[in-house]
Amino acid sequence: MAKEEFPGWHGTTIIGVRKGGKVVVAGDGQVSLGPTVIKGSARKVRRLSPGGYDVVCGFAGSTADAFTLLERLEAKLEATPGQLQRASVELAKDWRTDKYLQKLEAMLIVTDGSELYIITGAGDVLEPEHDIAAIGSGGNFALAAARGMMDSDKDAEAVARDAMAIASDICVYTNGNLTVETISA
């Protein structure tokens, strides 16, 4: 699967599912360098707690770039406590206009349990439809699988885990070694 097939997307899969008063963010653990799997147990889903305000973030793309963005998001959340949308928009504005940040290659899914966003380097802060956010090379596979399960009796974690299992069966840059974080509304 050539990188050009998923412009701006990178070898991983992250999904956020909101259902039943909870949001679950799950990410696989595979790190690839070209056609080689370098690591199978990376943690691409993190919990931030600036000022006691819990936020769960998942990232696809360069790890160093993602950590830079997570640090900036945490600073924005400290400056605007309890306002995830505002902090996300401020991060996206900086990311798009700052010459240093423009070079960062990553995408983020962020949630505080009630709001769920995808943040991109193009300046987008997207609130996904159908209570599902998915990014990365296997994101479309996970998104389609999760949408097919949302009307079932499965809870948010089961939907996220099952969607990730399907994505890992299809996308060679995604494995089944998951990190899962749950946050309540």
UniProtKB/Swiss-Prot annotation:
Biological processes per GO annotation: proteolysis involved in protein catabolic process
CC per GO annotation: HslUV protease complex; proteasome core complex
Residues binding Na(+): 168, 171, 174
Keyword terms, alphabetized: Allosteric enzyme, Cytoplasm, Hydrolase, Metal-binding, Protease, Sodium, Threonine protease
Protein biosynthesis as UniProt keyword: no
Residues the record marks as active site: 12
Catalytic activity: ATP-dependent cleavage of peptide bonds with broad specificity
Entry superkingdom: Bacteria
Regulation: Allosterically activated by HslU binding.
Assigned EC number: 3.4.25.2
Main location, first listed in the record: cytoplasm
Stored PROSITE patterns: PROTEASOME_BETA_2
Pfam families: Proteasome (PF00227)
Localization (cell): Cytoplasm
Family annotation (PANTHER family): ATP-DEPENDENT PROTEASE SUBUNIT HSLV, METALLOPROTEASE TLDD
HAMAP family xref list: HslV
Subunit structure: A double ring-shaped homohexamer of HslV is capped on each side by a ring-shaped HslU homohexamer. The assembly of the HslU/HslV complex is dependent on binding of ATP.
Known role: Protease subunit of a proteasome-like degradation complex believed to be a general protein degrading machinery.
Protein name: ATP-dependent protease subunit HslV
Source species: Jannaschia sp. (strain CCS1)
Gene: hslV
